[in-house]
Swiss-Prot record:
Residues involved in heme c 2 binding: C157, C161, H162
Organism: Stutzerimonas stutzeri (Pseudomonas stutzeri)
Keywords from the UniProt entry: Electron transport, Heme, Iron, Metal-binding, Periplasm, Repeat, Signal, Transport
Something else known: The second heme binding site has an unusual CXXXCH motif.
Modifications the protein undergoes after translation, according to the UniProt entry: Binds 2 heme c groups per subunit.
Superkingdom of origin organism: Bacteria
Keyword Amino-acid biosynthesis belongs to the record: no
Induction remarks: By anaerobic conditions.
Designated name of the protein: Cytochrome c-552
InterPro entries: Cyt-c552/DMSO_Rdtase_haem-bd, Cyt_c-like_dom
Length: 291
């Protein structure tokens, strides 16, 4: 993937956030390398569709150890166009829905905390009725250690996307995201952090047998702002936490993916990244070097 340097954001017009007292993100993000990531509208493309192989030819490549990003990173925007328009894998297209979002991701650490900074331009609103009127924007990322979750290494957070989860066609509204054979005790889970714009709140949870949006102890801080048409959200997360928190350590790589719920979206109507590796003082697709 292409990497660039990102100028630091200035002049917040709208600011939201929760504020941690101990950790401090880099004062000058312009010195931290940024990774360009295209998030795309995924339509109805659950893990079952990806791995079955009858409609998705990439299932064979996955069995050989290839990653989703290895095949699709350069065509993510095209995939989003096809699905947002209803040409493929979307039985109920939303007129005006943005097909993709280009984001930049920066990462750093101070030996005790991980800092993740996401920036992207606000797409034009679709004009559709809001699904979550209280939160125009939400952003979440997932971490996984050990590649115990199905598809975590190859597809990032796609291992939590199932065809019977809520907002999928015909699914019950009570069924949340989950992972196959999910178990905190056995390390089969995603660590989940989310920030919501309208509520001015951050959530620290996990996805195992179900999605739980509380109970984590690693998330210290999440701050977001809208400067003109550009969003900036910074997460501060301790290396170690508690149950449901992936423990981070220098020299290691972790499976990583993130999603943006734009335009007051909920459930599957988000924009998602493919799967990437996050390195803590180790070379990954995204590298969090000590500052």
């Amino acid at each position: 993937m292409k990497k660039t340097l990102m100028a630091s954001a200035v002049g917040a017009v709208i600011a939201f956030g929760t504020h941690g007292a101990m950790a401090a993100a880099p004062a000058d993000w312009s010195s931290v390398a940024a990774t360009d990531v295209t998030l795309f509208y995924p339509g109805v493309s659950p893990v079952e569709w990806i791995t079955k192989g009858t409609e998705h030819g990439g299932a064979r490549a996955l069995k050989k150890g290839e990653t989703c990003a290895g095949c699709h990173s350069e065509e993510a925007s095209d995939m989003g166009e096809k699905m947002a328009s209803g040409k493929k894998l979307e039985p109920s297209p939303i007129a005006g829905k943005a097909p993709f979002i280009n984001a930049k991701v920066q990462a750093a650490n101070d030996g005790e905390n991980l800092y993740l900074r996401f920036t992207w331009k606000q797409p034009a609103a679709s004009g559709a009725a809001p699904m979550d009127a209280d939160n125009p924007v939400k952003i979440a990322y997932m971490l996984e250690g050990g590649s115990k979750v199905e598809l975590a290494e190859a597809g990032g957070c796609w291992g939590s996307c199932h065809g019977d989860a809520r907002t999928m066609p015909g699914a019950a509204d009570t069924k949340t995201k989950y992972v196959k054979d999910g178990s905190l005790a056995n390390g089969v889970y995603y660590d989940l952090n989310q920030w919501r714009s309208g509520e001015n709140k951050a959530f620290d949870g996990y996805v195992a047998t179900e999605r739980v949006m509380e109970g984590g102890q690693a998330l210290v801080d999440a701050q977001g702002k809208l400067d003109g048409d550009t969003w900036t959200v910074v997460f501060t997360r301790k290396f170690a936490g508690g149950e449901g928190d992936v423990t981070l350590a220098p020299g290691n790589l972790y499976n990583f993916g993130f999603a943006i719920h734009d335009d007051s979206a909920t459930g599957r109507y988000h924009h998602v990244s493919l799967g990437y590796s996050l390195g803590i003082d180790a070379q990954g697709d995204i590298t969090a070097a000590k500052q």
